[in-house]
Structures are given as C-alpha cells and as structure tokens.
Amino acid sequence: MKIAVYGKGGIGKSTTSCNISIALARRGKKVLQIGCDPKHDSTFTLTGFLIPTIIDTLQSKDYHYEDVWPEDVIYKGYGGVDCVEAGGPPAGAGCGGYVVGETVKSLKELNAFYEYDIILFDVLGDVVCGGFAAPLNYADYCIIITDNGFDALFAANRIAASVREKAHTHPLRLAGLVGNRTSKRDLIDKYVEACPMPVLEVLPLIEDIRVSRVKGKTLFEMAESQPTLNYVCEFYLNIADQILSQPEGVVPKEIPDRELFSLLSDFYLNPINSGKNENIENNLHDFMII
C-alpha cells in the first residue's frame, strides 16, 4: 500500500507522517517513509538527523545507478521504519516531480520499492503544479493534514481537486482528513459537510506535538520516558488501523474557490448562524478574492 500525505505548508505533515509510520510499524508492517521536500527534513524525528538525499547520492555517483547500494540511500529510523529523503532541485530551478520520479526509479533499481508493506510519501506544501502532485501517481490513498482554519482548509480543497484529477487515470482515493493540533473541529465539519470526505482523526492541541519536532523524536519515542503521552499515540494508532482496513475512500468533488471562500468566511463573519465561536476576533482576517 502506498500513501501520499499532503497539506498546507507548516501544518505539521512531517510530524504527523512520522507518527503514522511508527503506528503502522507497531501494527507489524514493514514501512518506508519517503520525504519529498528539498529541505529533506521529513524523517528528522525518525532518525534524529538530516539524512543524505537520493539526489545528492546520485549526483555523487554521476547518476550511475549501478553504483548505488541500498545502504547509501535507505536509513533505519526509530521503531524499524526505513527512511529515504528524495531531496530536490536547487532553489528556483528544476522540478520536484522529476526528483520524485528519480527517487522511485532508484528504489526500483535497488529492488526496494516493492519490498515494503507500506510506503508513505510526505510531500511538501500545497499542490501548486503537476510536479508536486507526482507522488499521487504512485499512491493508493491520499491523506490531507489540516487544522480548523481558513487557510489550511482552502489548501485541502485544492489538494482534493488534484486527487480528483489523478483519479481519472490512477486507482487513487482520498482516505480522508486529519486535523492536527486543534482544539475545535467546527470549521472542518462545515467543510466536509459541503465536500463529503472522511475525517480520520482530530489531534488535540498540545504543545508536545510541536516540541517533538524540535527534539527530533516521535511522540512514541517521547512516550517511553513520558507515559502521559501514551494517550496521544492512540490517535495515530487509530489512523493506522483505519488505513490498514483498506477503506473504500472517496474521489472528492472540490468546492469552487468562490463558493468555498463564501462558506468559510461566512463562518467567521456570522458566528451566530455558524455556531458559537469564542475566539472570533482572533480568527478574523481580511479576505479578498479578485
């Protein structure tokens, strides 16, 4: 099974991906996580350091694939999760989709691409071009990470559009949304009411999730010395169990931008009609679509 994780930049995709990978490994699966970001920090909380990228390794070998060995590009992370960083082209040049393609090609050359029960692609930011959507070409499921905010759900809607487009030519389905570090889910519920899709889990607003990224540890590793965090790990295990049940998933029908803008902004501007919103003044922004 191959999973592509998307979401707005900075929403916590890598932290969530690493913990989902551990949860899948805890369920007895052989897992490979592939970071698809030039920052090559997707697997940082699994390995504790920035591992070399496949592109860097290929460049050092003059792209002689026969000179590349599995141990050159695949690193063992916490909990037995194998880790690969695709890397990316220089800033302002090249295509991220090409890098993903080269990564998959390299893993196939090493006979490693089909050795795993689960391959999880952790993909940078929003889908702004076909290159960034490249991991969807290989995925069975897409998971979108969001929060209870306007911008993240706007990005989620664009990703849903990419899933729908790719589903025309690939056996791809949207497994659902994961709400990350949010104390409420009312806006998420408002969105999925208009654009039906599963909500796999909503993770609580706790500082330890953010701190884990800085420490270079997953919540599972932190829970070994802080048993009070075990309850947070259960959220990720629940996501893993839903994925392993091979859900039917959906081919989403995204909401047109202007309709989504009206839907979400109305939620902020008319809290009486949209339900209670205690922090309306903190969440209100100036929105404008030209």
Curated annotation (Swiss-Prot):
Binds 1 [4Fe-4S] cluster per dimer. Pfam families: Fer4_NifH. It is found in: Plastid, Chloroplast. Mg(2+) binds at residue 14. It catalyses: chlorophyllide a + oxidized 2[4Fe-4S]-[ferredoxin] + 2 ADP + 2 phosphate = protochlorophyllide a + reduced 2[4Fe-4S]-[ferredoxin] + 2 ATP + 2 H2O. Gene3D superfamilies: P-loop containing nucleotide triphosphate hydrolases (3.40.50.300). It is an enzyme of class 1 (oxidoreductase). Pathway: Porphyrin-containing compound metabolism; chlorophyll biosynthesis (light-independent). GO terms for molecular function: 4 iron, 4 sulfur cluster binding; ATP binding; metal ion binding; oxidoreductase activity, acting on iron-sulfur proteins as donors; oxidoreductase activity, acting on the CH-CH group of donors, iron-sulfur protein as acceptor. Its main location: plastid. Its cofactor is [4Fe-4S] cluster. One of its GO terms (cellular component) is chloroplast. [4Fe-4S] cluster binds at residues 95, 129. Keywords: 4Fe-4S, ATP-binding, Chlorophyll biosynthesis, Chloroplast, Iron, Iron-sulfur, Magnesium, Metal-binding, Nucleotide-binding, Oxidoreductase, Photosynthesis, Plastid. Its EC number is 1.3.7.7. ATP binds at residues 10-15, 39, 180-181. SUPFAM superfamilies: P-loop containing nucleoside triphosphate hydrolases. InterPro entries: NifH/chlL_CS (IPR030655), NifH/frxC (IPR000392), P-loop_NTPase (IPR027417), Protochlorophyllide_ATP-bd (IPR005971). HAMAP family: ChlL_BchL (MF_00355). Homodimer. Protochlorophyllide reductase is composed of three subunits; ChlL, ChlN and ChlB. Component of the dark-operative protochlorophyllide reductase (DPOR) that uses Mg-ATP and reduced ferredoxin to reduce ring D of protochlorophyllide (Pchlide) to form chlorophyllide a (Chlide). This reaction is light-independent. The L component serves as a unique electron donor to the NB-component of the complex, and binds Mg-ATP. This is Light-independent protochlorophyllide reductase iron-sulfur ATP-binding protein. The gene is chlL.
